[in-house]
Amino acid sequence: MPRNNLNVNEKSFTEIKLLGKGKGGYSYLVTDGKNEFVLKQIHHEPCDYYKFGNKLEAELNDYRRLKEVGISIPEMIDFDGKTERILKEYIKGSTIYDLVLNGEVKESYLEQIRAMLKLLYPAKLNIDYFPTNFVVQNEILYYIDYECNSYSDEWNFENWGIKYWSKTEEFMAYNKT
């Protein structure tokens, strides 16, 4: 199967594989021939449960907010406003989702998410705590999405996110879909 070439500001990257699709875009593992990166292509598909304005602008603003707060996220390497693409550091490792499935979530990962919460909550922010948005590389937990929202109790980690960080009824129901 031929691989697609994807450009970011006229720099060419070769698609290795689709990593996943989220509310705002498709994420691809790409290479420049030397290094691997994640290329996020913004999409404009409807989302029943989320309202968007300018998705690229929102991603850029959210990235800045999360960098200021200081949680572990992949570095943004570049972005292309014309093609609505973001190039970011590739964090190679297992997602919390996969670790939950395999019964391999360690207490240290929960300690690390709690440390993130101590930075996020005073800044009045929530992130998307779904376990596919977290990758462990060299025992360090990274939030690999850039989405963040104003804090609300309903969507905080303790009331929503934690339900998907172990084999709960909610996690198992989602896993069947």
Where are these regions (language model features)?
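Juxta-kinase regulatory segment immediately upstream of eukaryotic protein kinase catalytic domains
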Residues: 1-17
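ATP-binding glycine-rich loop module of kinase domains
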Residues: 15-57
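C-lobe/activation-segment region of protein kinase-like
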Residues: 122-125, 137-177
